[in-house]
A protein has these predicted regions:
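A short hydrophobic beta-strand segment most commonly corresponding to one strand
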Residues: 168-184
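A short, N-terminal "cap"/entry segment at the start of jelly-roll beta-barrel domains
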Residues: 20-92, 185-193, 197-198
Length: 198
């Protein structure tokens, strides 16, 4: 209570105090970052190149979004009766999301890898697509997924994945989540340069 000299209240006064509280003002994790647009024409150019060159996985974009990197790839796999030896893939830092555009396939996933062997640092996939990781002979107690057009699947970093059968082909858009930023950046200009190469 604050006293007033001419009131019936106490004639003494308390000093006036103002409480100041620190406020946590939310800030974006990526300050001033532009959006990255990819046209269907550009994606189709990657698909055409993949089919013509039998090139399975191509990075379309890889961008910094603040606390993480995000990449978009176009993947096209031809018919597969059975997998090649030691073709289970695992990525240490990069998680992947597949959205199937066309075709169908059987994919096995799981974290318990059998006879895993590190990929060399010079491997093109390690350098350009999904960072350090391993290949393995098989997946112990793996889960089987029957993928078809329209489906999506999330494969966390450290989870092995293996296509055991591809009926005719499978084409999917790949989203890579790269929190440790192990994958090199690729912007629109770099993409155009890549596509222009013969």
């Amino acid at each position: 209570m604050i006293g007033h000299a001419n009131s019936g209240l106490n004639s003494w006064k308390y000093p006036c105090r103002t409480a100041v509280y620190a406020q946590n003002v939310p800030t974006a994790t990526c300050q001033g970052c532009p959006a990255s647009y990819i046209s269907n024409d550009e994606l189709q150019a990657y698909l055409k190149r993949a089919i013509a060159r039998n090139q399975i996985d191509q990075q379309v974009r890889s961008v910094d979004v603040g606390k993480s990197g995000v990449a978009v790839g176009m993947v096209h796999r031809a018919k597969l009766e059975k997998p090649q030896p030691n073709s289970v893939a695992e990525h240490d830092h990069v998680s992947e999301v597949y959205h199937v555009i066309s075709g169908s396939a059987t994919l096995v996933t799981g974290p318990d890898l059998v006879d895993a062997r590190r990929r060399p640092a010079t491997n093109e996939n390690v350098r350009l697509l999904n960072g350090p990781g391993a290949n393995a002979a098989s997946i112990r107690n793996g889960v089987t997924h029957e993928l078809k057009a329209g489906d999506a699947i999330i494969i966390p970093a450290g989870t092995g994945h293996l296509f055991t059968k591809i009926d005719d082909h499978i084409t999917y858009l790949m989203i890579r989540i790269d929190p440790d930023k192990v994958v090199p950046w690729k912007d629109e200009a770099a993409s155009k340069t890549y596509l222009s190469q013969q």
